[in-house]
Amino acid sequence: MSQRTESYLVGLVGDGVTPSLTPPMHEREGDVQGLRYLYRPIDLLELGLAGDSVGEVLRSARTLGFNGLNITHPCKQLVLQHLDEVSPDARRLGAVNTVVIRDGRFIGHNTDFSGFAAALASGLPGARLDRVVQLGAGGAGSAVAYALLSAGAKTLDLVDMDAERAAARAEELSGFFPDSTVTARTTADLPQLMPLADGLVHCTPVGMAAHPGVPLDLELLESRHWVADIVYRPIDTELVQGARAKGCDVLDGGRMAVGQAADAFRIFTGLDADPERMRSHFLELVAAEEVAA
């Protein structure tokens, strides 16, 4: 008697998601685990849809038998009003990037924060968290800050070009983590902050292929610092290269991308992904992109 192979249909909803590396990462892990796993980008720009159409996309996915969707810009906040249930951490963050469709209900999660937490634990085990400087307090930065504080960061200095945004984020996070100190800072404060810091986390677009450069003066880095970047295209950003040259322990952005994907895979399937196997495949995909370019 033949056994039926478990099958999954999932998608990625957002603007400009067609080139994303997330679908092939998921599909390869599904193949290795003996699943029929199909992951499709649902590019709102290509479809001529606005971000506020995400509710319609969710309902269509349910009708078509999707098991779940990953959600990215510009829909992570917009999707909240269409969900039946939201995990406590996603509710606190006010953003959802993973929706599982179960028994006709939409259940939201946030694997941005859990993906970074997993990356930090695996890529920088034992990193000191007495004081951390974080560059960028936007959407991704909020999730990373939440992960750092959840991991035990005692003092977190949020540095952002938008002082009001940094202040609002610091106040919000202080409410969630009353035993930690969260401060809003500006780039002008970095020369005073870095000598006091154990580590630096970078959460701005600087370093991406379209935004080359470094987000701070590399002379502020010391070999005792650890440095984490969430940019992964390219994987070796100028910050990562500069920090490595200074002798710092370094966490590249690919670790968070893989952590996000592994957590979403588990949410969709109920099966644990192998993060190191997924990272190996991720690095293959990035290398192939760089060769093609």
Curated annotation (Swiss-Prot):
Reaction catalyzed: shikimate + NADP(+) = 3-dehydroshikimate + NADPH + H(+)
Binding site for NADP(+): G136, A137, G138, G139, A140, I230, G253
CDD domains linked to this entry: NAD_bind_Shikimate_DH
Membrane-spanning segments: none
Superkingdom field: Bacteria
EC supergroup of this enzyme: oxidoreductase
Binding site for shikimate: S20, L21, T22, T72, N97, D112, Y232
CC annotations in GO: cytosol
A molecular-function term among this protein's GO annotations: shikimate 3-dehydrogenase (NADP+) activity
Enzyme Commission no: 1.1.1.25
Keyword DNA damage: no
Pathway participation: Metabolic intermediate biosynthesis; chorismate biosynthesis; chorismate from D-erythrose 4-phosphate and phosphoenolpyruvate: step 4/7
Keywords assigned: Amino-acid biosynthesis, Aromatic amino acid biosynthesis, NADP, Oxidoreductase
Record-annotated active site: K76 (proton acceptor)
Gene Ontology biological-process entries: amino acid biosynthetic process; aromatic amino acid family biosynthetic process; chorismate biosynthetic process; shikimate metabolic process
Similarity comment: Belongs to the shikimate dehydrogenase family.
Summary of subunit composition and partner proteins: Homodimer.
Function, in words: Involved in the biosynthesis of the chorismate, which leads to the biosynthesis of aromatic amino acids. Catalyzes the reversible NADPH linked reduction of 3-dehydroshikimate (DHSA) to yield shikimate (SA).
NCBIfam families: PRK12549.1
Protein name as catalogued: Shikimate dehydrogenase (NADP(+))
Protein's organism: Pseudarthrobacter chlorophenolicus (strain ATCC 700700 / DSM 12829 / CIP 107037 / JCM 12360 / KCTC 9906 / NCIMB 13794 / A6)
